[in-house]
Amino acid sequence: MNFTRIDLNTWNRREHFALYRQQIKCGFSLTTKLDITAFRTALAETDYKFYPVMIYLISRVVNQFPEFRMAMKDNALIYWDQTDPVFTVFHKETETFSALFCRYCPDISEFMAGYNAVMAEYQHNTALFPQGALPENHLNISSLPWVSFDGFNLNITGNDDYFAPVFTMAKFQQEDNRVLLPVSVQVHHAVCDGFHAARFINTLQMMCDNILK
């Protein structure tokens, strides 16, 4: 996969990157609730399922913003031209999950075809990584449909240069006449700030509101 190398001598976040990568090593998570009322109504008019469409939308937003596509490669900071989703699939019989991946395509019908092909081949394979090693250029998506939450955090240790974002969805919440979806965004502070996380959420909400428009 192609990528662009970032020149740390001229990058406007070089001081922030150095601080949060070398001195105050940290990431952060932001949890919010998406209003998916209109989204679910629009989705009901299609043959698409909720989870893969959310995988598509999250991937689409990630591929708009380079701060969510950053990685260390050959001791250099880069951002991928494109990142592909790694998503979890739960196995009821073993109470375990697998991590599958498919190629991101801007066209939703092409994306769904790729997703469905992966699911047809691997959804019943209970290995953690049925397809083998994950692609370098990946983002992470998972779902906890059994419980709702107001906050969610992963404690990632031992890999200070793991910059791939992690997105976690929860069980729907009903609030008056609205349906809300809790979503957690977890990022490395060396490459992503609160502004970027908020922009991601706001863009994702807009995409949910206009999924078929």
UniProtKB/Swiss-Prot annotation:
Keywords: Acyltransferase, Antibiotic resistance, Plasmid, Transferase
Enzyme Commission code(s) on record: 2.3.1.28
Membrane-spanning intervals of the chain: none
Reaction catalysis annotation: chloramphenicol + acetyl-CoA = chloramphenicol 3-acetate + CoA
Main EC class the enzyme belongs to: transferase
Pfam family, one: CAT
Biological processes, Gene Ontology terms: response to antibiotic
Superkingdom field: Bacteria
GO molecular function: chloramphenicol O-acetyltransferase activity
Catalytic-site annotation from UniProt: H189 (proton acceptor)
NCBIfam families named among the record's database cross-references: chloram_CatA
Anything else known: Type II chloramphenicol acetyltransferases are sensitive to inhibition by thiol-reactive reagents. The inactivation occurs as a result of chemical modification of Cys-26.
Subunit composition and interactions: Homotrimer.
Chain's role: This enzyme is an effector of chloramphenicol resistance in bacteria.
Classification via PANTHER family: CHLORAMPHENICOL ACETYLTRANSFERASE, SLR0299 PROTEIN
Family: Belongs to the chloramphenicol acetyltransferase family.
Protein known as: Chloramphenicol acetyltransferase 2
Source organism (scientific name): Haemophilus influenzae
Source lineage: Bacteria, Pseudomonadati, Pseudomonadota, Gammaproteobacteria, Pasteurellales
